[in-house]
Amino acid sequence: MAQKPLRLLTCGDVEGKFDILFNRVQAIQKKSGNFDLLLCVGNFFGSTPDAEWEEYKTGTKKAPIQTYVLGANNQETVKYFQDADGCELAENITYLGRKGIFTGSSGLQIVYLSGTESLNEPVPGYSFSPKDVSSLRTMLCTTSQFKGVDILLTSPWPKYVGNFGNSSGEVDTKKCGSALVSSLATGLKPRYHFAALEKTYYERLPYRNHIVLQENAQHATRFIALANVGNPEKKKYLYAFSIVPMKLMDAAELVKQPPDVTENPYRKSGQEASTGKQILAPVEESACQFFFDLNEKQGRKRSSTGRDSKSSPHPKQPRKPPQPPGPCWFCLASPEVEKHLVVNIGTHCYLALAKGGLSDDHVLILPIGHYQSVVELSAEVVEEVEKYKATLRRFFKSRGKRCVVFERNYKSHHLQLQVIPVPVSCCATDDIKDAFITQAQEQQIELLEIPEHSDIKQIAQPGAAYFYVELDTGEKLFHRIKKNFPLQFGREVLASEAILNVPDKSDWRQCQISKEDEETLARCFRKDFEPYDFTLDD
């Protein structure tokens, strides 16, 4: 049975004209049926007053489709994007983040890069650097199984995209655009590449990603630049298309060449093209292995196994976790880690007080190396995670508390197992379970109970986004995230009147304390936890 295609819409610079955009989308859906996603490139916010945006932000108005947007391209609009890792801006409107890979439940793979090119250091909050592009390429391109991605979203055009192609109109692609984006497109081989900022519509003829007669056939790339919303010249700013994720396609069907396919615009013509020489100097590859945003993990698993087996003289030695090429707030060796919050360090994991915790003893179990989710952990790391969980249960039980453990593998870079103690006097375990199920139903979240002794790896494949909660009885609840998911869901349930009764603490950013107070809490926890510290037994 053929895979049903996804129906997507892509939009150029919105520039704050939200009503015009969403009214147009509604009209299209009324006429042609519903679409699965709306992807926005270019400037989502403009220099117009915020009154129109406030209606969406407060929920007075709602986007009629799940919408994903890129970040700021100038200093003026940085204020709208509070979290560099991505966040929900309004209902049905999500900021993807500075850079990363979004893999939907369908398997569709979208790579995104926010901002404009900058070669300055430090890089402004609205720009990307050669290192950003290098890390994106490193995520995927270093595996032999890599064939390309479904969609690439950037705001700037790629430089030289007009080479060998149809006319790009008034835009001179030899002078306009970003060479870094060209390099990224060369490496990632997207089936579709969308960009904006130039206030015009340009659909380039598809170009090939292989050298004829020298390389095996590969899929073609279609580059589409979109105009700004509501432009007086009526230039096209919305693009509708259907796509089957490449991982689900028959290989022969995927590499079929369109009749109007051209040479790759990022390679020189003639004899130099036949030798595979590129116009662009390659972006320097990071020495680090991989850095995963959102959901992409499959490449890492395959690559790490092969790489370690070749490089290690001792096969039984635990394999090293992938290292992020950029800053990570939770890799213990990273200078970004707030080390005053660390309360215990094991061989493969460590404990840290949660910043803006639900209680003074709300802690996180984190891998020392860079892993994004539990399903990615190696056996030795899983073993120590379980040891920490069991030890914390005993510790909190001695203090008249039961603990709830949850993980949200969505919009996160580094695995964080949240461990929240709940006083036995507050409620029973069944009350906690009922609270999760009730709030999930209210928010139309399908929370399923899974077997007590089941392994999360049996139900969540690498690359899948999910939410998972484990109760002190061993009962487990699981939700496979398909589209959007409330980032604070776990905290909201536990902060509710039915459990901890601290609803004002549902968002960690609203309950931060001073560094001095954090240091005091950390000292107290270390002292109290010391009798249970299994790391002292080694």
From Swiss-Prot:
InterPro entries assigned to the protein according to its UniProt record, in alphabetical order: Cwf19-like, Cwf19-like_C_dom-1, Cwf19-like_C_dom-2, HIT-like_sf
Top-level taxon of the source organism: Eukaryota
GO BP annotations listed: mRNA splicing, via spliceosome
GO cellular component: post-mRNA release spliceosomal complex
Recorded GO MF terms: RNA lariat debranching enzyme activator activity
SUPFAM superfamilies: HIT-like
Disordered, as annotated region: 259-278, 298-324
Pfam families assigned to the protein according to its UniProt record, in alphabetical order: CwfJ_C_1, CwfJ_C_2
Family designation: Belongs to the CWF19 family.
Protein's UniProt name: CWF19-like protein 1
Organism: Pongo abelii (Sumatran orangutan)
